[in-house]
């Protein structure tokens, strides 16, 4: 059974991601380490004692569409009510609407634990938090006053409606339409697919944020508007009014996250009588909806990265517990009679340490991204720097962490051997749940394109160059520490950072020479190269914080393992970035 790693999470936040320094400088208001510890402890308790025990039944039963209504798995409605009672939905929401306005770092740490308990359940608050952010930033005063308080409390949930059958990654071709009405409202018509928690029985109302096109809108992405469309209309006194003209047509039958209802939503079908068209209100300006939605999408990408971290952590815990109990054969050098626990066999130990290193590296990257988001709002004159740092880290956090979630979950099955292939052990669920994360909220391939074409050029390339300089400083700090436990860590970090620096310089020059196809041929290898170097660097940073807690020896040992094993990939990845385009172009004849 999963147990929230509260101490490890707190350590990473404070001593690796930057929260401790931000608190000491007063950049996080009245927030102190004692309050941080208390919030993390209670979030961990909720994940361990309330969410995790219901994950299996959620996977087994799944969400069900019965007589036009979506029913959640047994126990999940009560679980959601407990969630509301705990006030968790409003951790980072504005205080004016009942939120706590706490740092984003705390929220993503809590999200990690809840996703480890059940990724399918945690998707509901994740989407609602994103909707709150979008309405807070772009909604009119009337929309905020009508909807935000109930969304912040969790009484009403939120969704994000982008995808259509023919419009996935390319939203410029979406066909959902909106028509103006004289009272300032709009009527929406169309179909949206893959809508997470689009319909369910846990909340009184569901607030859909829907992308649609006005009749006179420009073509492409410049003609997309964003609308708030509630399941139930809201009366002037705040009470619920009639059912809006929208419904869930069907639920998808998915590989994983079975407890999360993934809906096909129909708008404007006239199913409930009256005038056709789902009533909605404009969020932001007409034809500028994609910019409004991107705020929600960017933070959702980090939240999805946390899903990868969460699955990796839970899968690692399960595999390690099994490896300590399962006995097979005799490990080399084993003393005494009888079989050895498989954790003592070198190859099993290698797999488990790889799982641990990838998990902790992905956690540190994601928390560092959240720290940059917080500093972009709180750091005064340096806010622009932190805004760019958050932009640079977001695609890496999303892609590296979700790839790690899949890789670690797969290794977890391998550690279990044949039992891992049996559903009853629970190891397979982690892989089934993890597999969606590299796909949604922008595929990891799209994240790589974003990283290379939009994020490397920030400040003329100075942002990424400055970041690499910071990583070099970590390697120097390891070298000067003279701690034997680090082994060859400094040397391997130097080599990995040099590979990253060379690949970065080549990509920036290749883009400047207008050779976009060549640059994008190596975008995904570059993204992994960056993630691995960050993993080694952040694990080293944790190892250097030797006085922070009593686990310094363990942290240094894991750092050394990562540096001397995982970072061995960086040279090959650099070569794929710099030299892979020609062979890719030549081999495309095989795809014709």
What are these regions, as identified by a protein language model?
Residues 1-122, 146, 576, 582-592:
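Amphipathic, small/basic residue-rich leader segments at the start of a protein or domain
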Residues 1-24, 274-287, 318, 324-325, ...:
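Acidic, low-complexity proline/glycine-rich segments
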Residues 2-3, 180, 257, 368, ...:
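Alpha-helix capping/hinge segments and adjacent helical runs
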Residues 27-30, 60-73, 286-303, 317-355, ...:
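Glycine-rich cofactor-pocket loops
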Residues 63, 76, 125-128, 139-176, ...:
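Internal maturation/activation junctions in enzymes
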Residues 185, 189-243:
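A short core secondary-structure module
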Residues 194-196, 233-249, 254, 264-300, ...:
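A glycine-rich, basic-preceded beta-loop-alpha segment at the flavin cofactor/substrate interface
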Residues 458, 473-592:
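C-terminal amphipathic alpha-helical interaction region
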């Amino acid at each position: 059974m999963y147990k929230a790693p509260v101490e490890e999470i707190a350590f990473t936040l404070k001593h690796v991601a930057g929260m401790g320094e931000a608190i000491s400088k007063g950049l996080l208001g009245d927030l102190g380490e004692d309050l941080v510890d208390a919030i993390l402890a209670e979030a961990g308790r909720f994940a361990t004692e309330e969410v995790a025990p219901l994950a299996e039944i959620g996977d087994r039963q799944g969400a069900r569409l019965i007589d036009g209504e979506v029913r959640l798995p047994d126990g999940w409605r009560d679980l959601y009510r407990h969630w509301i009672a705990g006030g968790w939905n409003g951790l980072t929401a504005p205080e004016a609407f009942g939120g706590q306005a706490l740092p984003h770092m705390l929220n993503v740490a809590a999200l990690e634990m809840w996703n480890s308990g059940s990724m399918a359940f945690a998707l509901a608050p994740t989407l609602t938090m994103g909707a709150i952010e979008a309405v807070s930033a772009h909604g009119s005063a009337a929309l905020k006053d009508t909807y935000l308080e109930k969304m912040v409390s969790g009484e009403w949930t939120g969704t994000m409606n982008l995808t259509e059958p023919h419009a996935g990654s390319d939203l410029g071709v979406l066909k959902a339409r909106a028509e103006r009405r004289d009272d300032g409202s709009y009527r929406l018509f169309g179909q949206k697919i893959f809508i997470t928690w689009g319909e369910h029985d846990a909340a009184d109302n569901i607030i859909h944020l829907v992308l649609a096109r006005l009749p006179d809108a420009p073509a492409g992405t410049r003609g997309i508007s964003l609308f708030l469309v509630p399941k139930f209309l809201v009366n002037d006194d705040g009470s619920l009014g009639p059912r809006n003209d929208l419904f869930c047509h069907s639920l998808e039958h998915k590989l994983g996250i079975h407890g999360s209802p993934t809906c096909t939503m129909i708008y404007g079908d006239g199913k409930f009588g009256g005038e056709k068209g789902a009533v909605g209100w404009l969020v932001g300006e007409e034809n500028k909806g994609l910019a409004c939605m991107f705020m929600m999408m960017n933070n959702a990408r980090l939240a999805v990265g946390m899903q990868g971290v969460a699955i990796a952590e839970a899968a690692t815990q399960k595999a390690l517990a099994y490896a300590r109990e399962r006995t097979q054969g005799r490990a080399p050098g084993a003393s005494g009679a009888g079989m050895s626990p498989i954790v003592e066999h070198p190859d099993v130990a290698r797999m488990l340490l790889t799982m641990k290193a990838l998990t902790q590296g992905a956690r540190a990257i994601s928390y560092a991204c959240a720290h940059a988001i917080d500093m972009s709002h709180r750091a005064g004159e340096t806010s622009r720097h932190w805004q760019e740092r958050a932009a640079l880290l977001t695609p890496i956090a999303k892609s590296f962490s979700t790839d790690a979630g899949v890789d670690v979950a797969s290794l977890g099955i391998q550690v279990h051997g044949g039992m891992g292939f049996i559903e009853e052990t629970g190891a397979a669920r982690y892989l089934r749940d993890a597999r969606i994360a590299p796909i949604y909220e922008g595929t990891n391939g799209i994240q790589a394109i974003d990283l290379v074409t939009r994020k490397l050029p920030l400040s003329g390339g100075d942002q990424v160059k400055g970041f690499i300089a910071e990583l070099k400083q970590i390697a120097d700090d390891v070298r000067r520490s003279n701690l034997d436990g680090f082994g060859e860590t400094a040397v391997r970090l130097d080599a990995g950072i040099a590979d990253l620096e060379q690949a970065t310089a080549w990509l920036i020059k290749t883009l400047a020479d207008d050779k976009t196809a060549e640059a994008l041929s190596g975008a995904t290898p570059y993204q992994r190269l960056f993630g691995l170097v960050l993993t080694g660097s952040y694990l080293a940073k944790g190892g250097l914080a030797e006085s922070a807690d009593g686990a310094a020896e363990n942290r240094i040992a894991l750092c050394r393992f990562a540096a001397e094993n995982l970072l061995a990939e960086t040279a090959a990845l650099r070569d794929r970035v710099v030299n892979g385009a020609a062979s890719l172009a030549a081999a495309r004849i095989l795809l014709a």
